[in-house]
């Protein structure tokens, strides 16, 4: 207990018999009305409801109970323990309130559920729905740098399609040159609005197709010796 407070129940008598002198000494300055402390065994329910003009009062749990320069009524119902402040709630959620929730409110208003909590929850849900339903623009998708083919769901590149004019020009070039130099490949790519890589892949596939066709033709045609043997018979 602080030494600035004096227990009024303690008999202030001196062994020398100067009782009258002790009663004449003022305990506090003029105009100062201090809180009367009580022993630890004194119950909280018997605290008198009295109006004090204290400038500010703070609870031990770092949460402000009242902060007003005007007169404020401190009664037994305004004092709460740390357990009550952290656990007591009408909704049973156990949410710890901030310091501003206890300013200038009665005990009934302090634990009244906030009417704006439902609105805040609705705004949060709306924001979450907006996040998941946001439109996907074409520039947000993964695209093929050559012809604009969108990648599939498994990240596979789409099959490149050529127009009829592009196919005709490539076939004409393949008829004269089955292998292209890089310079010629760049010229054809610029003329047909394609990339050098697409031209290279198309010629590789076309050469494989041409080899298969030649192999099939050679296998179906009989050799010269077989034809002569059949003719001699």
Curated annotation (Swiss-Prot):
Q: Where is the composition biased (Polar residues)?
A: 107-119
From the record, which residues define motif Antp-type hexapeptide? 136-141
Query: Does Nucleus count among this protein's keywords?
Result: yes
PROSITE patterns given for it? Answer: ANTENNAPEDIA, HOMEOBOX_1, HOMEOBOX_2
The name on file for this protein is Homeobox protein Hox-A6
Instruction: Return the annotated DNA-binding positions.
Output: 155-214
A GO MF term: RNA polymerase II cis-regulatory region sequence-specific DNA binding
Q: Has the keyword DNA-binding been applied to this entry? A: yes
Q: What function does the entry list? A: Sequence-specific transcription factor which is part of a developmental regulatory system that provides cells with specific positional identities on the anterior-posterior axis.
Q: Where does this protein reside within or beyond the cell?
A: Nucleus
InterPro entries xrefs? Antp_homeobox, HD, HD_metazoa, Homeobox_antennapedia, Homeobox_Antennapedia_CS, Homeobox_CS, Homeodomain-like_sf
Region (Disordered) spans which residues? 89-127, 214-233
Q: Give the UniProt keywords, A-Z.
A: Developmental protein, DNA-binding, Homeobox, Nucleus, Transcription, Transcription regulation
Give the top-rank taxon of the lineage listed in the UniProt record for this protein. Answer: Eukaryota
Which family does the record claim for this protein?
Belongs to the Antp homeobox family.
Q: Name one GO cellular component term.
A: chromatin
Q: Name one GO biological process term.
A: regulation of transcription by RNA polymerase II
């Amino acid at each position: 207990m602080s030494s600035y407070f004096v227990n009024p129940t303690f008999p202030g008598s001196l062994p020398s018999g100067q009782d009258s002198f002790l009663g004449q000494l003022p305990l506090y300055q003029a105009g100062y009305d201090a809180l009367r402390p009580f022993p630890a065994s004194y119950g909280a329910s018997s605290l008198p409801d009295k109006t004090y003009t204290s400038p500010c009062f703070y609870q031990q749990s770092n949460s402000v109970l009242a902060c007003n320069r005007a007169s404020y009524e401190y009664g037994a119902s305004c004092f709460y323990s740390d357990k009550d402040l952290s656990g007591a709630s009408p909704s049973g959620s156990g949410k710890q309130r901030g310091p501003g929730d206890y300013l200038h409110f009665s005990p009934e208003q302090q634990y009244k559920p906030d009417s704006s909590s439902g609105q805040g929850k609705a705004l949060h849900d709306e924001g979450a729905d907006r996040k998941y339903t946001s439109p996907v623009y074409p520039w947000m998708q993964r695209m093929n740098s050559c012809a604009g083919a969108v990648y599939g769901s498994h990240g596979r590149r789409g099959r490149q399609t050529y127009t009829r004019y592009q196919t005709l020009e490539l076939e004409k070039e393949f008829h004269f040159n089955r292998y292209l130099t890089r310079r010629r490949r760049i010229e054809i790519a610029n003329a047909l609005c394609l990339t050098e890589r697409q031209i290279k892949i198309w010629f590789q596939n076309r050469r494989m197709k041409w080899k298969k066709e030649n192999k099939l033709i050679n296998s179906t045609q009989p050799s010269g010796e077989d034809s002569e043997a059949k003719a001699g018979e």
